[in-house]
Regions:
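N-terminal accessory segment detector
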Residues: 1-101, 109, 117-131, 135-168
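Anion (oxyanion) recognition and catalysis
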Residues: 112
Length: 168
């Protein structure tokens, strides 16, 4: 098995290559399709609780410094120190500018298949921190996004709203 220190370096270089070849979006969609094996039914059956179950396991496995919580019909996550980007920043290769795009790149389409609106705020391409939320309520998602844009004016927001619109 390849150690995570090496894996993220490899990922970083693959992202650079695929970006040059204009294939990065397709790669993220393929990752999303593969992730369905692990979590699509869990998210459909258990909703936000299933997401807590899945990402709680990932948080431990990848040694993430993060917290998540459910407030009513919204699941929030705050990745305080992303281990993946931290490792990319701590090596001799130049980090791919869009490294953090891989998370919303695969999570957004998966959330759309489950009927959830997803917003991710990537704090900066060299800042290993992000915040996200998921909800089935479109109005609430739009309202929360508007609030976050005020709260984090320097934010780099990604949503899956268009994917959900296309499904309806």
């Amino acid at each position: 098995m390849i150690p995570s220190d090496h894996f993220v370096r490899f990922y970083n270089e693959v992202f650079k290559f695929l970006d040059q070849k204009k294939g990065l979006t397709d790669f993220y969609l393929e990752i999303s399709r593969h992730q369905e094996i692990h979590c699509l039914e869990l998210f459909r059956k258990k909703g936000l609780e299933g997401m807590e179950e899945y990402w709680g396991h990932i948080r431990k496995e990848e040694n993430c410094v993060s917290e998540s919580w459910i407030d009513g019909d919204v699941r929030y996550s705050h990745m305080k120190r992303c281990p993946s980007l931290s490792k990319v920043l701590d090596n001799d290769a130049e980090p791919f500018a869009g490294y953090c795009e891989h998370c919303p790149g695969w999570v957004g389409p998966l959330m759309a298949k489950c009927g959830f609106y997803f917003v991710d705020n990537i704090m900066g391409e060299r800042v290993p921190e992000c915040r996200s939320f998921m909800t089935k309520d479109r109005e609430k998602a739009e309202c929360l996004l508007k609030e976050w844009k005020k709260q984090y004016p320097e934010g780099n927001f990604r949503t899956n709203f268009e994917l959900l619109k296309a499904q309806k």
